[in-house]
From Swiss-Prot:
Its cofactor is Mg(2+). It holds the Pfam family FGGY_N. It catalyses: L-rhamnulose + ATP = L-rhamnulose 1-phosphate + ADP + H(+). Belongs to the rhamnulokinase family. One of its GO terms (molecular function) is rhamnulokinase activity. This is Rhamnulokinase. Substrate binds at G83, H236, D237, T238, N296. Involved in the catabolism of L-rhamnose (6-deoxy-L-mannose). Catalyzes the transfer of the gamma-phosphate group from ATP to the 1-hydroxyl group of L-rhamnulose to yield L-rhamnulose 1-phosphate. Keywords: ATP-binding, Disulfide bond, Kinase, Magnesium, Nucleotide-binding, Rhamnose metabolism, Transferase. ATP binds at A13, S14, S15, G16, R17, T259, Q304, G402. Pathway: Carbohydrate degradation; L-rhamnose degradation; glycerone phosphate from L-rhamnose: step 2/3. InterPro entries: ATPase_NBD, FGGY_C, FGGY_N, Rhamnulokinase. The keyword Transferase applies.
Length: 489
């Protein structure tokens, strides 16, 4: 038997994990084992919302050392994280300024300023990326405007996964899939756009040319002295999750469900027409030159904040209580900017319902019901937008990531979208990370080959839409009202 041992470091906004994958070549089987799981979260530091990158690095090294202490020979390591955030370094590789998080308010108002000065259409034609107020483009503008004293000290700007790879190897890399989330990469050249960089105030010399997934960045020397290659995987966690989505045919859509919900489809070409711009669709980079045509949805961040504020520890019990409540009594727009990082999420949700003359969700279950119903309805709207954009309906939706364990939300999604939902794998980002490593090690041919492995080894659950459910009737009523308004217009 020939085995490969690959380690995936998967960092999310609320937690991180070091996972060991064992791949058996002869039977093409892949097993995962969690080595170390640790918390991540936002911190307040000197008036900014930041990440504790030192703590994250320590946790990564602890997890890697645990694998080595077991006497396991690691064949490769890969790191994926969330997008848009970065770390600045000086000529000696020391940090400059703070690792500010995208939920900080420093970039407020700058997106509108960019659209006015550069033109919304021009920015979109250059980058193909959706407009979000915390994109790196606006974060860099905030930094260079508000902290100009830092600029003379900056030599390099590394996105989060590239920073941690640098800390392990001493080598710098700018991985393509994550670089595209910045809204600074030109969609035609796959290189940094000089006009957008100039507006941001950043120096192009801070960045190296983006590289597509699959190259070896450098080597980490383990405590035993072995040199272990660190691979540039699809380092944006959603890009990795999509790689591990067992998409079957061109009519399959995906939903990467976690702190954020990312809904989209794969395409060989980007969509940057007026319809895509109006719908704020993004064309993020994927593996093998594919595009992840998708839309960001605020996701389970709202629930995470409610759980924290209400000190709820028993999520299954909450979901059971939520399921017993009637649907669609409290509806909000999860993508409203007011929910990016409010002081109190529960109060913000209640205020949104109050302002629209709805009943007010008071109990834990009512707040959860509001979030789940609102997300499912938004999923249905976005799926419809995506189908219109490409001119073809979808036949199935693959929900991957930690959020796919929420069976109530999966069923609500199936009912609201009127589409078959396949849930799993849960550890999609980790698996996609491993997939690129195995391709780099010449164990697998390509993404489609890897998806066959995932399909046969992952635990997948199918949810069939129920046209008689409350939320399905609610969606039908909305569509009927819209059609009536269009006829009367």
């Amino acid at each position: 038997m020939t085995f490969r041992n690959c380690v995936a470091v998967d960092l999310g906004a609320s937690s991180g994990r070091v996972m060991l994958a064992r791949y058996e070549r002869e039977c093409r089987s892949l097993t995962l084992r969690e080595i170390h799981r640790f918390k991540n979260g936002l911190h307040s530091q000197n008036g900014y919302v930041t990440w504790n990158v030192d703590s994250l690095e320590s946790a990564i090294r602890l997890g890697l050392n645990k694998v080595c202490e077991e006497g396991i020979r690691i064949d490769s390591i890969g790191i994926d994280t969330w997008g848009v955030d970065f770390v600045l370094l000086d000529q000696q590789g020391q940090r400059v300024g703070l690792p500010v998080a995208y939920r900080d308010s420093r970039s407020n108002g700058l997106m509108a300023q960019a659209q006015q000065q550069l033109g919304k259409r021009d920015i979109y034609q250059r980058s193909g990326i959706q407009f979000l107020p915390f994109n790196t483009l606006y974060q860099l503008r905030a930094l260079t405007e508000q902290q100009p004293e830092l600029i003379p000290h900056i030599a390099h700007a590394l996105l989060m996964p590239d920073y941690f790879s640098y800390r392990l190897t001493g080598k710098m890399n700018w991985e393509y899939t994550n670089a595209t989330t910045t809204q600074l990469v030109n969609i035609n050249s796959d290189d940094w756009d000089e006009s957008l960089l100039a507006w941001s105030g950043a120096n192009k010399a801070w960045f190296g040319r983006p590289t597509h997934p699959g190259n070896v960045i450098g080597h980490w020397i383990c405590p035993q002295g072995n040199e272990i290659p660190v691979v540039a995987v699809a380092s944006h966690d959603t890009a990795s999750a999509v790689i591990a989505s067992p998409l079957n045919g061109s009519r399959a859509a995906y939903l990467s469900s976690g702190t954020w919900s990312l809904m989209g489809f794969e395409s060989q070409t980007p969509f940057t027409n007026d319809t895509a711009l109006a719908a704020n669709i993004t064309n993020e980079g994927g593996a093998e030159g594919r595009y992840r045509v998708l839309k960001n949805i605020m996701g389970l961040w709202l629930l995470q904040r409610v759980l924290q504020e209400r000190q709820i520890n028993d999520l299954p019990a909450l979901i059971a209580a939520t399921q017993a409540l009637p649907a669609c009594r409290f509806i909000i727009n999860p993508n409203d900017d007011r929910f990016i990082n409010p002081e109190a999420m529960c109060s913000e949700i209640q205020a949104a319902c109050r302002e629209t003359a709805q009943p007010i969700p008071e109990s834990d279950a009512e707040l959860a019901r509001c979030i789940f119903d609102s997300l499912a309805l938004l999923y249905a709207d976005v799926l419809h937008e995506l189908a219109q954009l490409r001119g073809e309906d979808f036949s199935q939706l693959h929900i991957v990531g930690g959020g796919c364990q929420n069976t109530l939300l999966n069923q609500l999604c199936a009912d609201a979208c009127g589409i078959r939902v396949i849930a799993g794998p849960v550890e999609a980002s980790t698996l996609g990370n491993i997939g690129i490593q195995l391709m780099t090690l010449d164990e697998l041919n390509n993404v489609d080959d890897f998806r066959q492995v995932v399909s046969t080894t992952a635990n997948l659950t199918t949810f069939t839409p129920n046209p008689d459910s409350e939320i399905a009737h609610y969606v039908a009523q909305i569509h009927s009202t819209r059609q009536t308004k269009e006829l009367c217009a």
